[in-house]
């Protein structure tokens, strides 16, 4: 999953990977729904955290 992305992603890359807007990606990080690291003034998301978010989101979908 997400093989074409680096091991540590920017918020912009996360938005692209999830096909959501940049504001929505920041909202996921700010609400702690998506684990992220602050490196200086930048926010970085380790790929395993993005994959975990997607797995968790899939399990929470109600049909």
Regions found by a protein language model. Give the residues of each.
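Extended rod-forming repeat segments used as scaffolds/tethers
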Residues: 14, 33, 58-60
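Serine/threonine-rich, low-complexity intrinsically disordered segments
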Residues: 10, 44-45
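Short amphipathic alpha-helical/adjacent loop interface patches that line ligand
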Residues: 22, 47, 54
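Polyanion-binding surface elements
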Residues: 1-24
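A short, Lys/Arg-enriched interface patch at domain edges and termini
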Residues: 50-63
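Major-groove DNA-recognition helix of helix-turn-helix-type DNA-binding domains
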Residues: 18-44
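A generic "binding-loop/recognition-motif" signal
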Residues: 41, 49-50
């Amino acid at each position: 999953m997400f093989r074409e992305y680096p091991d540590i992603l920017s918020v912009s890359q996360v938005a692209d990977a999830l096909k959501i807007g940049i504001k929505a990606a920041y909202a996921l990080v700010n609400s702690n729904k998506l684990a992220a690291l602050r490196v200086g003034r930048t926010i970085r998301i380790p790929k395993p955290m993005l994959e975990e978010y997607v797995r968790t989101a899939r399990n929470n979908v109600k049909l």
